[in-house]
Amino acid sequence: PLYSSAASDVYKRQTVSKELAESINLQGATVLDVGCGLGGPCRMLADEYNCQVTGLDLSNEYIRTAKELSKLVKLDSKTSFIQGDATSLPFDDNTFDVIWTQHVQMNIPNKEKFYSEISRVLKSGGHFLYYEILKKGDGEVNYPMPWASTSEISFLFKETEMDNFLTKFGLIKKQSNDQTTYGIDFLNAVFAKMKEFVPPKIGLNALMGETTKQKLVNVLGHLKSGELELKSGVYKK
């Protein structure tokens, strides 16, 4: 199925998404994907788990494209997409069974407000599922990165800090999975393909610009060195 576009990008990998989805009973759940991008995971959840999924993103262009892709694969009745701010979610308290985030928090400076809002709109007994790139070491990070050209617009933090915020807002950790090796293997595969042909304009280059290769080199280097890590997991409210 066409869950994502040619930009089924470096981090929003369907394999990890499905692994995360299988960690709880998602059948028929109402789901909010915060920072949904082009909506790939939204369509996967709607199609395979019969979820009613709302995707929210700050980018109007991403929202427009996500709507078009969902209509193209006839999932527009199960998905909806709105432009909005992750630190001021336009929803009532206790609205969703599941909140889903994938590689979003790195661009959000106010982590406390971000996780406070996630807790607010999540129903009691609901689940927060995440897949994030996090700081692990204490060294400097080289830029550009896939999510930020400079350090001024990058707001990485550590897993312990994330856990502190979520615990503060009433969520209990159920599981945490290290996906770093998986990410390294995927990036190595990307570089192997780059040697074989020039990447198409509608692929990663379209999302990351002319510095795509350097961004991938930097993130791969930091994952290998242990400065950064990839983690997925589940919290319950």
Language-model segment annotations:
Residues 112-127:
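A short glycine-rich, Lys/Arg-flanked "PGG" loop and its adjoining helix->strand segment in the class I
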Residues 98-110:
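A short SAM/SAH-binding and catalytic strip from SAM-dependent methyltransferases
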Residues 87-98:
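A short acidic, Gly/Pro-enriched loop at the edge of an enzyme's catalytic core
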Residues 12-27:
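Conserved alpha-helix/loop element of class I SAM-dependent methyltransferases that forms part
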Residues 32-34, 38-88:
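Class I SAM-dependent methyltransferase SAM/SAH-binding core
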Residues 1-7, 11:
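Single conserved hydrophobic/aromatic residue that forms the stacking wall/gate
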